[in-house]
Amino acid sequence: MTCCEGWTSCNGFSLLVLLLLGVVLNAIPLIVSLVEEDQFSQNPISCFEWWFPGIIGAGLMAIPATTMSLTARKRACCNNRTGMFLSSLFSVITVIGALYCMLISIQALLKGPLMCNSPSNSNANCEFSLKNISDIHPESFNLQWFFNDSCAPPTGFNKPTSNDTMASGWRASSFHFDSEENKHRLIHFSVFLGLLLVGILEVLFGLSQIVIGFLGCLCGVSKRRSQIV
């Protein structure tokens, strides 16, 4: 087995695990909404799970590269130069899907759950448009909706000081499922942080398979031993 085949096998199994993890993470808020309200879209935790970053971005778009990487490994049906090339080509789709998953996850972590932005907590306030991704600014990525005691907009006119923010950050360790708001914040933060990590790892494995696939196509794969009768 050449190093290209071994690395392709590693990439294939890693992408398979990340693919399944992305689908499961994306499904968590959908299932919670179904269990709570007996409807999928009546009062969602956030708008962003309906962009399906884990099911489509990290899931469906990673299937071609995952399948070809697993079939291009040693003793598999596509263990040849063509299989290596196709695994590299399909990995481009994986990288695009992973980047989509990352961008949606970053936007979700920036905005917070729907309860923090809309008192009605209704999907009528969801705007499904990719142009919102261009509005991401690093200075606004402070996760105050998660670290503050409450993510509801303040009623007073006093701006929170840095000491108040730090104190709220220390109090965040006392999060429990004692209210619907805390539950939505914890689920939202955990799901989209997990999807962000899944997207980052899929980008790394996808880029590595692009390189390894081209090397395997150029250098060839190990020959199968002829069967002795």
From Swiss-Prot:
Topology feature Lumenal, residues: 1-14, 66-83, 207-229
Compartments in which it is found: Membrane; Endoplasmic reticulum membrane
Record keywords, A-Z: Autism spectrum disorder, Endoplasmic reticulum, Membrane, Transmembrane, Transmembrane helix
Site (Cleavage): F13, S14
Result of changing L16P: No effect on cleavage of the first 13 residues
Mutagenesis / variant outcome for changing S14P: Abolishes cleavage of the first 13 residues
Induction: TGFB1 inhibits TM4SF20 expression to activate CREB3L1.
Keyword set includes Transferase: no
Tagged with keyword Endoplasmic reticulum: yes
GO biological process: negative regulation of proteolysis
Domains as described in the record: The first transmembrane helix plays a critical role for the insertion orientation in the endoplasmic reticulum membrane.
Family: Belongs to the L6 tetraspanin family.
Function statement: Polytopic transmembrane protein that inhibits regulated intramembrane proteolysis (RIP) of CREB3L1, inhibiting its activation and the induction of collagen synthesis. In response to ceramide, which alters TM4SF20 membrane topology, stimulates RIP activation of CREB3L1. Ceramide reverses the direction through which transmembrane helices are translocated into the endoplasmic reticulum membrane during translation of TM4SF20, this mechanism is called 'regulated alternative translocation' (RAT) and regulates the function of the transmembrane protein.
Record disease entry: Specific language impairment 5: A disorder characterized by a delay in early speech acquisition. It is usually associated with cerebral white matter abnormalities on brain MRI. Some individuals may show disorders in communication, consistent with autism spectrum disorder, or global developmental delay, although others ultimately show normal cognitive function. Penetrance is incomplete and expressivity is variable.
Protein name as annotated: Transmembrane 4 L6 family member 20
